[in-house]
């Protein structure tokens, strides 16, 4: 294939011109991807549907060349390439890839992922069978890249941010979904928040669940997350991004008239509860290093929710402790899964008051009272 990297980037044209619209656009953010991109591209070839998909490599200003690894696939897959103006954030790289997408369905893969053979055929068949118009989600495997051993099967788990397929016309374009370019982390969670709001507007609260394993997620350190910060401190270090991608995303969509107030309220209070458990866990594990500014971010978010949604601390607590405290417990479990040990040192209501007092007096429910209500 007599094409060079700069020609592909400059023109945005595919290495192979398809005579019809591809079913899938697979967007792959790349950065110094030479060690892993071969396995990923070969796994796409092994889907045996190369005439029905396009691959978009979106490079985030790599400092190490890897085009020699891509070149052998230029006559096997319809490959497009693009490059960001400067190295900044993962959302910016993904957004650049979306601009070139022409497929009916979008999906995103990290450069060290590997698709399981022929799984995209099953995804396509199931989407068509059930005539899904918006969003589909499948399972994935967490794999040790050194041994190839499966560490866990991510199947109908709390983590719905991965193995998702988005309809380009009915969902992505219709609801004007874009990555938030200034997020250094949690860009996938932000997209999930936007998609959830769009599905709510479309009266389709749940994506189509496809019970198959779609790809292997290689559980290795990356320059963006664990290599630099570790699993635990990563969330603490980028807590502001977490709030931007979750709570703020929902409340902003309510302000734009895209979702009802109750849906935004549910999301906002869920984020506050998770933040409560997160912050207590951080302080318990390492009180000296805990980032004090995270409390400032949380205080700003709580005040924002009160101003936009008309919430009070009493209402937030009552909402969280309602229905046998199932909502409260759900967030506690999610937090424990995310950061490990959860050791609350104060009640949720006291924590809310610590962040921001309501003007009017109210009664504080103690931990023992909460336990009684839970019964």
Positions of the model-derived regions?
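Conserved nucleotide-sugar donor-binding catalytic segment
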Residues: 153-234
